[in-house]
Amino acid sequence: MHGPKPTVKDIELDLAPEAVPLVCNEQLDSSDEEDCIDVVEPAQQAYRVVTLCTKCSTTLRLVVESSEADIRAFQELLLRTLKIVCPRCA
């Protein structure tokens, strides 16, 4: 904007990032490089989990949202050491 009074035509709306050359021996921050990489999140899906309370054998129903890989890991935990108890037994 130039002059004593700004006008609408003086406002520049094109704000594209500009390429700036690196100074000698300067390196990009790793966070700048990570911003340029598109990370694809695994698809989340709702899963119904039916299991038994380990103390009183009451049927427990859970709904969880997870990726397919994570729900398989959850299943492995349930088959091994992870035990879920009902609110009454907790």
UniProtKB/Swiss-Prot annotation:
Keyword flag Zinc-finger: yes
UniProt KW keywords: Activator, DNA-binding, Early protein, G1/S host cell cycle checkpoint dysregulation by virus, Host cytoplasm, Host nucleus, Host-virus interaction, Inhibition of host innate immune response by virus, Inhibition of host interferon signaling pathway by virus, Interferon antiviral system evasion, Metal-binding, Modulation of host cell cycle by virus, Oncogene, Transcription, Transcription regulation, Viral immunoevasion, Zinc, Zinc-finger
Zinc fingers (unnamed), renumbered ranges: 53-89
GO aspect biological process, one term: symbiont-mediated perturbation of host cell cycle G1/S transition checkpoint
Compartments (UniProt record): Host cytoplasm; Host nucleus
One Gene Ontology term of the molecular function aspect: DNA binding
InterPro entries with a match to the protein in the record: Papilloma_E7
Region (E7 terminal domain): 1-41
Segments carrying motif LXCXE motif: 22-26
GO cellular component: host cell cytoplasm; host cell nucleus
Subcellular location, principal: host cell
Pfam families assigned: E7
Reported modifications of this chain: Highly phosphorylated.
Sequence motif: Nuclear export signal, positions: 71-79
Domain notes: The E7 terminal domain is an intrinsically disordered domain, whose flexibility and conformational transitions confer target adaptability to the oncoprotein. It allows adaptation to a variety of protein targets and exposes the PEST degradation sequence that regulates its turnover in the cell.
Subunit note: Homodimer. Homooligomer. Interacts with host RB1; this interaction induces dissociation of RB1-E2F1 complex thereby disrupting RB1 activity. Interacts with host EP300; this interaction represses EP300 transcriptional activity. Interacts with protein E2; this interaction inhibits E7 oncogenic activity. Interacts with host TMEM173/STING; this interaction impairs the ability of TMEM173/STING to sense cytosolic DNA and promote the production of type I interferon (IFN-alpha and IFN-beta).
Role played: Plays a role in viral genome replication by driving entry of quiescent cells into the cell cycle. Stimulation of progression from G1 to S phase allows the virus to efficiently use the cellular DNA replicating machinery to achieve viral genome replication. E7 protein has both transforming and trans-activating activities. Induces the disassembly of the E2F1 transcription factor from RB1, with subsequent transcriptional activation of E2F1-regulated S-phase genes. Interferes with host histone deacetylation mediated by HDAC1 and HDAC2, leading to transcription activation.
Family, as annotated: Belongs to the papillomaviridae E7 protein family.
Protein name per its UniProtKB record: Protein E7
